[in-house]
């Protein structure tokens, strides 16, 4: 992914105006596109605005976000505030994968499982739902490392649920570069966008698609199918 890409914040005035618009349109569920919510000082102001707006207008009913990877005291405070006012949809403790090889290939790192488990315990003490997010199909991930990683996650954690997502290819990312694909044997399949928390699109609306990884140097299509079956069963049984 574009892990080193620079970004700029929208102004707080614009963010607050969008929250007011959500309440005006009586939108029940809001998904925050910020992939590291809670890492910046202004995020507490945004959380307070959400609480204030819900108190006044009863909307939005629920707010979901992707929390910063290095969970800090501020994230605990923000999550507690949202949970207190029944806005919280749960705290993400994202790992993507437990495979060191896959992490190296996508230029990511993880906190240790012991520290991860401690964070989960702290959130559970506050009755804040916790869920883990994993990504299936990253380059360098074998079937055995995938299964072993999920098993270790369950054995050492107390998360309420595990969400497993397909690895996707996005424009303007290293994973979409021809030389990167060749190096890791990446092949993708284009499918219709799998949307949740929304009504079916009207036929005349623009159709959207996503490119998911279905082959790598460590995974052929049959292996991908096998991983999918295992992952779906795990999510059903562990939820």
Model-identified regions with their sequence ranges:
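Canonical Radical SAM [4Fe-4S] cluster-binding loop centered on the CxxxCxxC motif
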Residues: 1-13
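Conserved SAM/AdoMet-binding glycine-rich loop
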Residues: 12-131, 136-138
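Flexible glycine/acidic-rich beta-alpha junction loops that bind and position SAM and/or redox cofactors
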Residues: 40-42, 96, 100-107, 136-144, ...
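Short, hinge-like loop/turn segments at secondary-structure boundaries
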Residues: 49, 149-150, 179-183
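Phosphate/diphosphate-binding loops
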Residues: 65, 150-153, 164
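Catalytic cores of alpha/beta
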Residues: 77-80, 139-155, 223
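Charge-patterned, long linear interaction tracts outside catalytic cores
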Residues: 220-239
């Amino acid at each position: 992914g574009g892990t080193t890409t620079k970004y700029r914040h929208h102004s707080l005035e614009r963010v607050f105006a969008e929250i007011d618009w959500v309440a005006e349109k009586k939108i029940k569920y809001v998904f925050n596109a910020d992939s590291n919510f809670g890492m910046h000082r202004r995020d507490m102001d945004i959380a307070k605005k959400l609480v204030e707006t819900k108190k006044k207008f009863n909307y939005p009913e629920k707010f979901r976000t992707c929390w910063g990877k290095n969970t800090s005291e501020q994230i605990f405070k923000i999550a507690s505030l949202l949970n207190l006012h029944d806005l919280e949809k749960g705290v993400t403790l994202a790992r993507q994968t437990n495979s060191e090889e896959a992490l190296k290939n996508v230029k990511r790192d993880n906190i240790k499982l012991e520290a991860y488990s401690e964070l989960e315990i702290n959130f559970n003490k506050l009755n804040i739902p916790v869920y883990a997010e994993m990504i299936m199909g990253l380059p360098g991930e074998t079937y055995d490392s995938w299964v072993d990683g999920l098993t270790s996650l369950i054995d050492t954690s107390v998360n309420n649920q595990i969400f497993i997502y397909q690895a996707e290819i996005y424009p303007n990312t290293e994973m979409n570069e021809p030389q990167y694909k060749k190096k890791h044997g990446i092949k993708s399949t284009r499918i219709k966008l799998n949307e949740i928390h929304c009504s079916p699109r009207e036929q005349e609306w623009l159709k959207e698609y996503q490119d998911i990884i279905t082959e790598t140097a460590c995974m052929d299509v049959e292996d991908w199918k096998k991983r999918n079956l295992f992952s779906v069963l795990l999510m059903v049984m562990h939820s």
